[in-house]
Amino acid sequence: MKENDILQAQDVRFRYDTEQPNFAVDGVSMEVHRGEFVAVLGANGCGKSTLAKHFNAILLPESGTVLVEDMDTRTDEKLYDIRQKVGMVFQNPDNQIVATVVEEDVAFALENLGVPTGEMRTRVDDAMKLAGIYEQRNKAPHKLSGGQKQRVAIAGVIAMRPDCLILDEATAMLDP
């Protein structure tokens, strides 16, 4: 792994059912450098989301290696550090929203990380403003549009201030 690499995949292979011959990800190798913007394009069902879930160890490769700043995603002791460094916004925001009020949802991960209250308030407000959801901060997420829910999910990850942000079609549901 090069000094400025934040993510590296080497010959990653993954299949959801090891009894089946077809791989969802088959031999992918790539590097993402710090500060770089990368888009992975492909047809529906080609493995883009599956690959993305490898970068914060939601999925682990059947073979090959995924490194986050030289930390192997298969190393249990590094899982916490990896997930702090790589934030992910899922394609469907309902899979990510856990609280009953928008600002509580944005603060959820920060509470789990033990971020001090004053800093948490600043991060939550800044993230909600950046994601364009600040005006909805006291609303229930289930009463928001799909695009607004996506903004809540984006704000929650931004508030964590990860070194790398993975967006799995995160703008697909956004309102104009």
Per-range role (PLM):
Residues 118-136:
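Conserved ABC ATPase "signature" region
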Residues 161:
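Conserved catalytic motifs of ABC-family nucleotide-binding domains
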Residues 56:
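Helix-to-loop junction immediately C-terminal to a conserved catalytic motif
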Residues 140-144, 148:
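Conserved ABC ATPase signature
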Residues 165-168:
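Catalytic Walker B motif of ABC-type/P-loop ATPase nucleotide-binding domains
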Residues 64-74, 82:
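Conserved ABC transporter NBD signature motif
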Residues 41-43:
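The feature captures the beta-strand-to-loop junction immediately N-terminal to the Walker
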